[in-house]
Amino acid sequence: DPRLTLRKAMSGGGDFSALVRRDRVVRHPPVVALCDISGSMTDYTRVFLHFLHRLTEDRRRVETFLFGTRLSHVTRALRARDIDAALADVSGAVQDWSGGTRIAASLHEFNRLWSRRVLGQGAIVLLFTDGLERDSDGSLAAEMERLHKSCRRLIWLNPLLRYDRFEPRAAGIRAMLPHVDEFRPVHQLASLEDLALALSRPALRADVDPRHWLRRAGG
């Protein structure tokens, strides 16, 4: 159970090694993670990959993709049982760590090549990015809309929500917000615990409703 694992990690100084499982067998919907590994996300990527590694062990149907300036499919690497080995395999499979970001282009590649293969059976998409897009051709909104229509739930995880005075002013953020079901922080273990709970018991809270932020953005 990822939520109980995170609780143990919080009480044990960040140790993710003990995965807590529940006896009751639950058939979870597929989870597809799209993770921004650009320079602006560096401080958060490793912790989120730890979370995905445990989620991959706990659930049968988890697919993970990383993107900076290109899209990389790293599901097989994350299936290594040892977390250090898994992260080493992921690092070896990706060439654009901590560089620039092209969100629209990466989503276009996913939508074109992978969407039909991994988004069936009510899949939940976890989009891990700050939304600071560098492309300016206006395609981001269209790619987000296509992604949203292809999945059951699209959850945007944005570390910028750690700021009390955060405002959705950046063009990329404004383009993406209308096409997500939940808008969540992802800057600490407590926020990942909330995410684990949301994956198990979906219920939209007011504080993660994107409509709140759309109103603030004037959308």
Please report, for each region that a protein language model flagged, where it lies by residue.
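Structural beta-sheet core signal
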Residues: 33, 64-66, 127, 156
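Von Willebrand factor
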Residues: 84-123, 161, 165-168
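Metal-dependent catalytic core segments for phosphate chemistry
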Residues: 21, 43-46, 50-102
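Negatively charged sequence features
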Residues: 1-29
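Von Willebrand factor type A / integrin I
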Residues: 144-219
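Short acidic, Gly/Ser-rich segments with clustered Asp/Glu that frequently serve as metal-coordination loops
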Residues: 32-46, 71, 132-135
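Extracytoplasmic/secreted cell-surface and envelope-processing proteins
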Residues: 135-138, 194-195
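Structural motif
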Residues: 30-32, 122-126, 153
